[in-house]
A protein has these predicted regions:
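Aromatic-residue-lined binding/catalytic grooves and analogous aromatic/hydrophobic interfacial grooves
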Residues: 1-186
């Protein structure tokens, strides 16, 4: 299930023993500015092109368009995902039942529900626009029933550290196939 607020996005896979949340953020771009991409076409050329097409001179119009309406072969980069947040859960040996995933279109909350033995588990994930954060809320019908290990698998060159209760990752969005460069992030 995909969720997001226009800047932060995630794909919630909804597993029971392992939950994967693929993370995304709008500024994660590889590449760099390339002034050679800006080939001026000009108002005169556009008028000439329109004239050819309106007169039915398609071949001549295509010649002008093919010659002037494209960038050069340099790549300016691409948008790339951040990485995967993984939660690995430990449960007492028992039967899983009542598994259900949903996305409430009114609240934009992705929910995963299931029961193991006599314990009901609920995971809710959403991205708020006013607070500009991604939230994962986990609950269980019995106290101390949630036992999970957290890991972050970064798809970019990065370092991960902690500061109090914050997980910090910083690095560079580099994708050699798309050329040099990329934004730095924290």
């Amino acid at each position: 299930v995909r969720i997001g607020n226009g800047r932060i996005g995630a794909m919630v896979f909804g597993g029971i023993e392992e939950e994967t949340i693929a993370l995304n953020e709008s500024s994660m771009w590889s590449g760099q500015y390339d002034e050679n991409q800006e080939i001026p076409f000009g108002k005169e050329r556009m008028n000439e092109l329109r004239k050819f097409f309106f007169e039915g001179k398609i071949q001549e119009g295509n010649q002008i368009a093919g010659e002037f309406l494209h960038g050069n072969g340099h790549s300016f980069g691409t948008h790339l995902p951040i990485g995967d947040l993984k939660l690995t859960f430990s449960y007492p040996e028992n039967t899983v039942s009542n598994y259900r995933r949903s996305l409430d279109l009114g609240t934009a909350i992705s929910t995963t529900n299931y029961t193991i033995g006599d314990v009901n588990y609920v995971r809710e994930c959403f991205a708020t626009n006013p607070d500009d954060v991604l939230v994962l809320r986990m609950s269980a019908s019995k106290k101390k029933a949630i036992n999970a290990k957290l890991s972050l698998s970064m798809l970019r060159e990065s370092e991960i550290s902690t500061d109090g209760n914050q997980l910090i990752f910083e690095g560079t969005v580099n994708f050699p196939k798309q050329g040099p460069g990329g934004v730095s992030f924290q």
